[in-house]
């Protein structure tokens, strides 16, 4: 591995690494690898590829969170209209310089919650992949923020959120999923039960398309990698004690 550059980020030092064996590139902020991709920007993370697949039928997509910009790059290359928001301006420069993010993709430097409140456009899809050292998902995705996300979707729109979960005892995915299911949306959780410090995806679709949603989720579930499970959220109240998450494996 060799270091292509080091930069000052808002949450710690950002380092860009490159594998001399494979050519893959890595975006590391603080102690966390935010992105891993080919030199052309194709993500190596399974969850990013799942987010890309989930947004396959969309035309306009709002991405909250940049990192190496892999998801934005992959969607833009499909001809989608992509808008990216991140609080760290250096992320956009690094995504374009090292990870192939097209220069024409609109990038906005802003706190994602403030951006949602100010934005007036509606989108076919919204993807959320934010985080970093000290980030608390339960605090950041409170009911008001979840409402702001859904408010920026078209009536037929969909949303998908990536979050980090420490253990099966973490109730945050269920709380956030329940809040995202208010109003006209419904949600599912993709998880890796039993793993520590894992990625969890929350996928949201319009409630009124129940039959179409079941068909879509069943079809989408068959495309995901080994080990992922699909379930509906439980409804713990905020402030409740954590409980073991009941997971049902996909067939």
Predicted features along the sequence, with ranges:
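Conserved S-adenosyl-L-methionine
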Residues: 184-195
């Amino acid at each position: 591995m060799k270091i292509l550059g080091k930069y000052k980020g808002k949450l710690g030092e950002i380092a860009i690494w490159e594998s001399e064996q494979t050519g893959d590139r890595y975006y590391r902020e603080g102690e966390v690898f935010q992105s891993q991709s080919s030199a052309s920007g194709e993500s190596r993370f399974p969850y990013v590829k799942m987010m890309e697949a989930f947004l396959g039928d969309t035309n306009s997509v709002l991405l909250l969170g940049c990192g190496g910009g892999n998801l934005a790059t992959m969607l833009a290359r499909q001809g989608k209209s992509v808008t990216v928001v991140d609080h760290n301006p250096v992320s956009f420069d690094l995504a374009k310089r090292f990870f192939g993010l097209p220069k024409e993709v609109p990038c906005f430097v802003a706190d994602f919650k403030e951006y949602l409140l100010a934005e007036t456009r509606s989108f076919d899809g919204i993807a959320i992949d934010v985080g970093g050292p000290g980030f608390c998902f339960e605090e950041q995705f409170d009911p008001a923020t979840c409402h702001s996300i859904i408010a920026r979707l078209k009536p037929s729109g969909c949303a998908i959120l990536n979050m980090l979960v420490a253990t099966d005892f973490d109730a945050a995915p269920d709380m956030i999923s329940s809040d995202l299911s208010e109003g006209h949306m419904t949600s599912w959780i993709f998880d890796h039960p039993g793993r520590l410090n894992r990625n969890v995806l929350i996928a949201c679709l319009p409630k009124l398309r129940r039959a179409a949603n079941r068909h879509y989720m069943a079809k989408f579930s068959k495309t995901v990698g080994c080990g992922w499970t699909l379930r509906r959220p439980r409804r713990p109240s905020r402030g409740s004690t954590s409980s073991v998450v009941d997971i049902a494996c996909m067939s």
